């Protein structure tokens, strides 16, 4: 399966920069998936979870508050205001990421009625790491 280049950027820096087999994004009209050779598009993203399928078939999740994505045949560039990668090498690192993600959710809670879904996906992603 072909790979694509993925960058997730915030005003504070890079959250993810690497290759992926697929990316699932929380679009304004609903979730959508992107594979290599995808048609070009630019669209808004709402609060949700970006799932990144890596070459080893593992999935990394990144919680975002909102942003925009540009897709072309070889790369995906995601620009977001706030994001937290749900990852860590230890239980304490995962717990810190989970706490940071919950703080991000609190900051957007009033703006998004689908926040319960985001919270459930966040908890699921954290459990997969433990």
From Swiss-Prot:
Keyword hit for Cell membrane: yes
Bilayer disposition of the protein: Peripheral membrane protein
Gene3D superfamilies: F0F1 ATP synthase delta/epsilon subunit, N-terminal (2.60.15.10)
Domain of life: Bacteria
Keyword field contains Cell membrane: yes
Stored InterPro entries: ATP_synth_F1_dsu/esu, ATP_synth_F1_dsu/esu_N, ATPsynth_dsu/esu_N
One GO cellular component, as annotated: proton-transporting ATP synthase complex
Keywords attached to this entry: ATP synthesis, Cell inner membrane, Cell membrane, CF(1), Hydrogen ion transport, Ion transport, Membrane, Transport
Pfam families hit by this protein: ATP-synt_DE_N (PF02823)
GO molecular function, one term: proton-transporting ATP synthase activity, rotational mechanism
Record localization: Cell inner membrane
Main subcellular localisation: membrane
Family membership noted in the UniProt record: Belongs to the ATPase epsilon chain family.
PANTHER family attached to this UniProt entry: ATP SYNTHASE DELTA/EPSILON CHAIN, ATP SYNTHASE EPSILON CHAIN, CHLOROPLASTIC
Assembly with partners or alone: F-type ATPases have 2 components, CF(1) - the catalytic core - and CF(0) - the membrane proton channel. CF(1) has five subunits: alpha(3), beta(3), gamma(1), delta(1), epsilon(1). CF(0) has three main subunits: a, b and c.
Protein role: Produces ATP from ADP in the presence of a proton gradient across the membrane.
Protein known as: ATP synthase epsilon chain
